[in-house]
Amino acid sequence: MAKNLEDFDKIIVLDFGSQYNQLITRRIRDFGIYSELLPHDLSIEKIKEMNPKGIIFSGGPNSVYDDGALKVDPEIFKLGIPILGICYGMQLMSYDLGGKVERAENKEYGRANITVEDPDSALFKGLPTKQYVWMSHGDLVTQAPEGFEVTASSKNCPIAAIANPDKKFYGIQFHAEVRNSEYGLDILKHFAFDVCGAVANWTMADFIDMQVDEIRKEVGDKKVILGLSGGVDSSVTATLLHKAIGDQLTAIFVDHGMLRKDEGDQVMKALNKDLGVNIIRVNAQERFLNKLKGVTDPEQKRKIIGKEFIEVFNEEAKKLKDVDFLAQGTLYTDVIESGTNTAQTIKSHHNVGGLPEDMNFKLIEPLRKLFKDEVRELGEKLGIPHDLVWRQPFPGPGLGIRVLGEVTEDKLKIVRESDAILREEIKKAGLQEKIWQYFTVLPGIRSVGVMGDGRTYDYTIGIRAVTSIDGMTADFAQIPWDVLGHISDRIVNEVDNVNRIVYDVTSKPPSTIEWE
């Protein structure tokens, strides 16, 4: 019998709008403790019902003293539950409990060195008294509330951490959830285990049992359709749904003509033949390309592709009859990149944007609370072949957003062939599981070259390869020069109309992983 959430220790994170907020949830789950990101104005009654071991206030872009600043119900401080405030969360707790918060004369953005004033304080116990952290604030606490001690400081932030051990209230001005804070994970562990007394009793096996039970309760005897791309997200979604409801699921594999080389056939073999998922394959390449003619704006391309997907689903659903649910492989990172109630939109995501208002299906998103690496772990637990689980992340719009500008069949062929060479050589070099994501893009730039005895004026191919844990932040992958050189040689010699290769050495942020 599947367990309920009440059976697990949990720490909830209240969302005040930081783009890092879901990383906090991710880190807590890494410790084996269940965690969810919830609205900042979550009711006291709901908090009591959830009975968390601890509460974390996330960071955010507001100033606590401004009109319209995001707040919490003051009763939250009377629940007897440990609280950790991060950045804005620390300022809010200080402000609400009688401390002072003011605009900083010297703002801190980026790496900073803090000095731990009280090495015996619960959060810093056993850690170095000098450590680098990641700061991102324009305000600071200038007076701690009564009953609090200052436990850390930095050059521009005299009150960088505070503690009230009696009430188990703690605050840090820096972002412990970001990997740039060298002992950030230790600080979060101290809060979760030492302060909150939580027990690590949450596993992916538990998630499977709970999600299967939840899907069965929600779907009942109704039918579900799923848009299948062949990527990790949709493949794991299909397998999880198949485990829960069997043949009530029909996966609609919309081949929009923007897939990677041979991907369509590989999808059919792995999921339909080997795993038994019921799949209908729809060849819609011409339809999609006609809709994309003359379109160059990336947001518009995403919207068109998303809308066309749903229209295909509607048509296929009518053929199937009595379909009530549309499943999607939406992840936590998809949701945050499309903005939440408190976070600014970075770009509309293919899984959560472009849905028509008159959509005839109820939406079911069983992976919505998971990050990419958790999805891979889930896939392995479900018995999906290793090669499929570790397939490179692939956006719903496919190669359509890796061709910058207008999408044509000829341009898709260039990207598809160059991408296949890149993937083949990365695998030969044994780097396929060391690099989080890698692909080629066609920027639409032509340049002069010399091939044979003649002058050429052909396309440039960009190579993008990054290392990451969860897609929230990423660094460019340091592929050995000889491997990059060989990839370049092969692409310019084997792919028509290409005479130049460039390598993207930008991190996320400031760039996103995809170029569009």
Curated annotation (Swiss-Prot):
Keyword ATP-binding appears in the UniProt entry: yes
Its annotated pathway reads: Purine metabolism; GMP biosynthesis; GMP from XMP (L-Gln route): step 1/1
Binding-site residues for ATP, renumbered to this chain = S229, G230, G231, V232, D233, S234, S235
EC number of this enzyme: 6.3.5.2
Q: Which InterPro entries match?
A: Class_I_gatase-like (IPR029062), GATASE (IPR017926), GMP_synth_C (IPR001674), GMP_synth_GATase (IPR004739), GMP_synthase (IPR022955), GMPS_ATP_PPase_dom (IPR025777), NAD/GMP_synthase (IPR022310), Rossmann-like_a/b/a_fold (IPR014729)
In Gene Ontology terms, what is one molecular function of this protein?
GMP synthase activity
Residue stretches making up the Glutamine amidotransferase type-1 domain: 10-201
Checking HAMAP family in the record gives: GMP_synthase
| Gene it is expressed from | guaA
Q: What is this protein called?
A: GMP synthase [glutamine-hydrolyzing]
Q: What does this protein do?
A: Catalyzes the synthesis of GMP from XMP.
| Key words of the record | ATP-binding, Glutamine amidotransferase, GMP biosynthesis, Ligase, Nucleotide-binding, Purine biosynthesis
Which Pfam families does the UniProt record give?
GATase, GMP_synt_C, NAD_synthase
* Catalyzed reaction equations: XMP + L-glutamine + ATP + H2O = GMP + L-glutamate + AMP + diphosphate + 2 H(+)
The answer on whether this UniProt entry bears the keyword Ligase reads: yes
